[in-house]
Curated annotation (Swiss-Prot):
Catalysed reactions, as listed in the record: RNA(n) + a ribonucleoside 5'-triphosphate = RNA(n+1) + diphosphate
InterPro entries: DNA-dir_RNA_pol_bsu_ext_1_sf (IPR042107), DNA-dir_RNA_pol_su2 (IPR015712), DNA-dir_RNAP_su2_dom (IPR007120), DNA-dir_RNAP_su2_hyb_sf (IPR037033), RNA_pol_bsu_bac (IPR010243), RNA_pol_bsu_CS (IPR007121), RNA_pol_Rpb2_2 (IPR007642), RNA_pol_Rpb2_2_sf (IPR037034)
Keywords: Chloroplast, DNA-directed RNA polymerase, Nucleotidyltransferase, Plastid, Transcription, Transferase
Subunit record text: In plastids the minimal PEP RNA polymerase catalytic core is composed of four subunits: alpha, beta, beta', and beta''. When a (nuclear-encoded) sigma factor is associated with the core the holoenzyme is formed, which can initiate transcription.
CDD domains in UniProt: RNA_pol_B_RPB2
Protein name: DNA-directed RNA polymerase subunit beta
GO biological process: DNA-templated transcription
The protein's role, per its UniProt record: DNA-dependent RNA polymerase catalyzes the transcription of DNA into RNA using the four ribonucleoside triphosphates as substrates.
Species annotation: Barbarea verna (Land cress)
Membership in a protein family: Belongs to the RNA polymerase beta chain family.
UniProt-listed Enzyme Commission number(s): 2.7.7.6
């Protein structure tokens, strides 16, 4: 990205670069670092020594391809081999062997790993950087209390605080604190050394009492005092080696290991020059920190902003994988120790290969990718989603924050985020501000800091030489950084005027001559999602946030279409997502079909397999369509085949459709959307979805389960699609309830159900007669479609732990329907409320009916005016057959630049098409349109245009659900919750109030008793419904009331209830 040859030029970096660089750093540095830490292992008698020679490690190329790993549910990994030596000290003999340590999952070209056939991605985490931080808080008297917090590499904290008598304490736990002199003495310093190494010895001497002198008289006394306070132990503990080890393990290892980043930060903050390889906290650090704290008390020095990015570090893929390798090697060390002692005990001669097993490394990485919170299943809804997922930054995870504990200041946008973390793109809900997204040009530096690029402007001539710099958050505070207008092309005017700039987290207006650096790109401070929104500068940030989230939920359509109005980043996103097939070198196409493209180049013939109807983990359809013809010559980097949601190598998530902003009979009230039937019959918003259904065969105690077509007691109609093996045939159309895989599970029948001849066989020959239970895979509700693939995965060693898995893939074609969610790129979302015949839709002056009607009231209050600009410019583009790519913040060139562009294009479209209604000067951008039902014009002119509208993955087919009867919760006896459990609809507190307000007593009673948790009453309802007659009233209490009584009894409170007769007011007491 840094172009040194051509000064002042830069290109957009690869969007997966962060992941690739992290993995490369792990393979190149992290692997060797961890292997070099592996200790020499000796037996108890010190006769045998085992060691690894990490200089000769080797990673072997995987035997399987990525696609096969996904198909067979395997891990795409590389085998790690290291040379190991076993030395017999008595004879000085050494046996050296190349040993297999385990498998390390590899990263593929998408920046993801394939583990057990599933694409997984590791998220970057933001943590508080290890080092020291000074802060002040007000106590209950309103006096400032200064504290210095030392944060270790593991996240452990040691707090130094100064009281009003200028005494310095180290807080070792929430309740206990000890004098700084005791801590320094316990760490190995005597009083003379302490006083020689501090700037204010008189302050240290001032709180040195006789009692304190006794505590620090010797190192042993100091350690005992420290141990007593730290462990809250009463009495007089005795100094011993085990006591020192316990302190070392519980305190010094957790709270005093700084790591290389922590050592660098402390050296910089306290002005020390301790060597970088000293990664533990030293007495000198403690004393320098105390000096600095005293200076703070007297008004010298500055406090630290904990939320500034210079005080944060990024824990990347490299760090996480390296930590796991260290963990695996520690487990391997224990295994080797155990094996050596076992071999000596049994008088066996060990070899390096016998001592080492590959299980610790392989299982550690499998559990890391499967269970670690920062390892997530790659979201593959569309190409944008795949790329954005790998660029997330999370404050959550081990050592980080939680959604419940994080305060508002941490979630808020900080000035240091500028050009590093996107101020717009974050999740909604409890994790808002805790999960961010990397800005386009940001990169992770060597010390775990986020760096952003700037152009350096030289003093003498602001034009002649321009150089590009990458600055960390701690460096860019010292520069005047121009923003906004400084990017204008008209440099002549610019030099005469003042420009907005950023300096030390403040925004100033300064003369152009004073500028040191300037931004390199209009998109520099945004993430990819936000950079795809045209006219984003005219939108409220909340709506831009929703839009960048909703673009990730867009479903790839069966016929994709490029946006007329875009930002120019669409091509880069599509290329980096790996969805289109791209030529790796030039050549000539020899053959092409839907399955593969064959071309010759460099004297070789290459065959590129295409993805055909592959399921993503969000059930969307991934498919590649060839874009080249036979005999055509191609160049390196040319698009060979388009993928899902790409057209000509550009991202294409939605459709440009004709939209009017107007109310229509209340059908678009409150974000509802009215659409034309053309969108359904023209397959404009039709998408394909592939669902996976699987079943496993186990070996039970009664014998193995069988896959068969011969299923007793089932109608032949349900088995019509099965082949002779009992598995559904490819290409068959299946409906709800059909059998996909026939399976019988052996089951021993009860004694009473045996036939007499079975009993005779059992008595004479001892043969156990088994009957089979039908456990077939049936198609659930809403699953109807076409079977497009069947996979029978048989894992090696087909034991009961490795069952055979049969997977059936069914494709569904879904047109747009009432209840589906659609959205624009400006946070304007809505649910389809009605599908109108095309003749009833409002139509334009040239007779074209509108495709979609939005509510105009959704624009002013939400302040997302960008959609109006996009809408009008899209209309002009469709009439002129042009596509526009507009960078954000075009107002830096001139005022009202967006509006001028839109109106000039509309005027040109009006002239070229000879349609004066396209641009009418009285109400520019609006037009008179007609009611399709009556043919009369509407009273007011209406904004019409062609915005880019997406269909989202929230579809009514996945949400709609009904329940007549089903399962009940065991404790409350109320229906379960959720669609997956066939649950019921909750009637909550507010729903009860609504029914009470209408006075519908009987409906309310039904909902709270028969339909819910009154066990006897609901059984009676079933009987009376079948026989006919009136439903009897429930007489006793429902189960939830009985549950309340039981819970009160557990608190020793007895609650009795009575039934009062309506006729004679007789009180009838009943036991609950």
């Amino acid at each position: 990205m840094l172009g040194d040859g051509k000064e002042g030029t830069s290109t957009i970096p690869g969007f997966n670069q962060i992941q690739f660089e992290g993995f490369y750093r792990f393979i190149d540095q992290g692997l060797i670092e961890e292997l070099s830490k592996f200790p020499k292992i000796e037996d108890i008698d010190h006769e045998i020594e085992f060691q690894l020679f990490m200089e000769t490690y080797q990673l072997v190329e995987p035997l399987i391809k990525e696609r096969d790993a996904v198909y067979e549910s395997l891990t795409y990994s590389s085998e790690l081999y290291v040379s190991a030596g076993l030395i017999w000290k008595t004879s000085r003999n050494m046996q050296e062997q190349r040993i297999f340590i385990g498998n390390i999952p590899l990263m593929n070209s998408l920046g993801t790993s394939i583990v057990n056939g599933i694409y997984r991605i590791v998220i970057n985490q933001i943590l508080q950087s290890p080092g020291i931080y000074y802060q002040s808080e007000l106590d209950h008297n309103g006096i400032s209390v200064y504290t210095g917090t030392i944060i270790s590499d593991w996240g452990g904290r040691l707090e130094l605080e100064i009281d009003k008598k200028a005494r310095i304490w180290a807080r070792v736990s929430r309740k206990q604190k000890i004098s700084i002199l005791v801590l320094s003495s316990a760490m190995g310093s005597n009083l003379r050394e302490i006083l020689e190494n501090v700037c204010y010895p008189e302050i240290f001497l001032s709180f040195l009492t006789d009692k304190e002198k006794k505590k620090i008289g010797s190192k042993e006394n100091a350690i005992l005092e420290f141990y007593q306070q730290f462990s809250c132990v009463g009495g007089d503990p005795i100094f011993s080696e085990s006591l020192c080890k316990e302190l070392q393990k519980k305190f010094f290892h957790q709270r005093c290991e700084l790591g290389r980043i922590g050592r660098r930060n402390i050296n910089w903050r306290l002005n020390l020059n301790i060597p970088q390889n000293n990664i533990f906290l030293l007495p000198r650090d403690i004393l320098a920190a105390a000096d600095h704290l005293i200076g703070m008390k007297f008004g010298m020095g500055t406090l630290d902003d904990m939320n500034h990015l210079k005080n944060k570090r990024i824990r990347s893929v490299a760090d996480l994988l390296q930590d796991q390798l260290g963990l695996a090697l520690a487990r391997l060390e224990n295994v080797v120790k155990g094996t050596i002692s076992g071999a000596i005990r049994h008088k066996l001669i060990p070899t390096p290969q016998n001592l080492v097993t590959s299980t610790p490394l392989t299982t550690t990485y499998e559990s890391f990718f499967g269970l670690h919170p920062l390892s997530q299943v790659l979201d593959r809804t569309n190409p944008l989603t795949q790329i954005v997922h790998g660029r997330k930054l999370s404050y959550l995870g081990p050592g980080g924050l939680t959604g419940r504990t994080a305060n508002f200041r941490i979630r808020d946008i900080h000035p240091s985020h500028y050009g590093r973390i996107c101020p717009i793109d974050t999740s909604e809900g409890i994790n808002v501000g805790l999960i961010g997204s990397l800005s386009i040009h940001a990169r992770i530096g060597d010390w775990g800091s986020l760096e952003s690029p700037f152009y350096e402007l030289f003093e003498k001539s602001k034009k002649a030489r321009i150089r590009m710099l990458f600055l960390s958050p701690s460096q860019d505070e010292y520069y005047m950084i121009a923003a906004g207008n400084s990017l204008a092309l008209n440099r002549g005017i610019q030099e005469e005027q003042a420009v907005p700039a950023r300096y030390r987290q403040e925004f100033l207006t300064i003369a152009w001559e004073e500028v040191h650096l300037r931004s390199i790109f209009p998109f520099q401070y945004f993430s990819i999602g936000a950079s795809l929104i045209p006219f984003i500068e005219h939108n409220d940030a909340n709506r831009a946030l929703m839009s960048s989230n909703m673009q990730r939920q867009a479903v790839p359509l069966s016929r994709s279409e490029k946006c007329i109005v875009g930002t120019g980043l669409e091509r880069q996103v599509a290329l980096d997502s790996g969805v289109p097939a791209i030529a790796e070198h030039e050549g000539k196409i020899l053959y092409t079909d839907t399955e593969k493209i064959v071309f010759s180049g460099n004297g070789d013939t290459l065959s590129i397999p295409l993805i055909m109807y592959e399921r993503s983990n969000k059930n969307t359809c991934m498919h590649q369509k060839p874009q080249v013809r036979r005999g055509k010559c191609i160049k390196k980097g040319q698009i060979l085949a388009d993928g899902a949601a790409t057209v000509g190598g550009e991202l294409a998530l939605g459709k440009n459709i004709l939209v009017a902003y107007m109310p229509w009979e209340g059908y678009n009230f409150e974000d509802a959307v009215l659409i034309s039937e053309c969108l359904v019959y023209g397959d404009i918003y039709t998408s394909f979805h592939i669902r996976k259904y699987e079943i496993q065969t186990h070996v039970t105690t009664q014998g193995p389960e069988r896959i068969t077509k011969e299923i007793p007691h089932l109608e032949g109609r349900l088995l019509r699609n099965l082949d002779k093996n009992g598995i559904v045939m490819l290409g068959s159309w299946v409906e709800t309830g059909d059998i996909l895989v026939g399976k019988l599970t052996p089951q021993v029948a009860k004694e009473s159900s045996y036939a007499p001849e079975d009993r005779l066989l059992r008595a004479i020959l001892g043969i156990q007669v088994s009957t089979s239970k039908e456990t077939c895979l049936k198609l659930p509700i809403g699953g109807r479609g076409r079977v497009i693939d069947v996979r029978w995965v048989q894992k090696k060693g087909g034991s009961s732990y490795n069952p055979e898995i049969i997977r059936v893939y069914i494709s569904q074609k879904r047109e747009i329907k009432v209840g589906d969610k659609v959205a624009g790129r400006h946070g304007n979302k809505g649910i389809i409320s009605k599908i109108l015949p095309r003749q009833d839709m409002p139509y334009l002056q040239d007779g074209r009916p509108v495709d979609m009607v939005f509510n105009p009231l959704g624009v002013p209050s939400r302040m997302n005016v960008g959609q109006i600009f996009e809408c009008s410019l899209g209309l002009a583009g469709s009439l002129l057959d042009r596509h526009y790519r507009i960078a954000p913040f075009d107002e830096r060139y001139e005022q009202e630049a967006s509006r001028k562009l839109v109106f000039s294009e509309l005027y040109e479209a009006s002239k070229q098409t000879a349609n004066p209604w396209v641009f009418e000067p009285e109400y520019p951008g609006k037009s008179r349109i007609f009611d399709g039902r009556t043919g009369d014009p509407f009273e007011q002119p209406v904004i019409i245009g062609k915005p880019y509208i997406l269909k989202l993955i929230h579809q009514v087919d996945d949400k709609i659900h009904g329940r007549s009867s089903g399962h009940y919760a065991l404790v409350t006896q109320q229906p379960l919750r959720g669609r997956s459990k066939q649950g019921g609809q909750r009637v909550g507190e507010m729903e009860v109030w609504a029914l009470e307000g209408f006075g519908v007593a009987h409906i309310l009673q039904e909902m709270l008793t028969y339909k819910s948790d009154h066990i006897r009453a609901r059984q009676e309802v079933l009987g009376t419904t079948i026989i006919g007659g009136t439903i009897p009233k429930p007489e006793d209490a429902p189960e939830s009331f009985r549950l309340l009584v039981r819970e009160l009894r557990s608190l020793a409170l007895e609650l009795n209830h009575f039934l009062v007769s309506e006729k004679n007011f007789q009180i009838n007491r009943k036991e609950v």
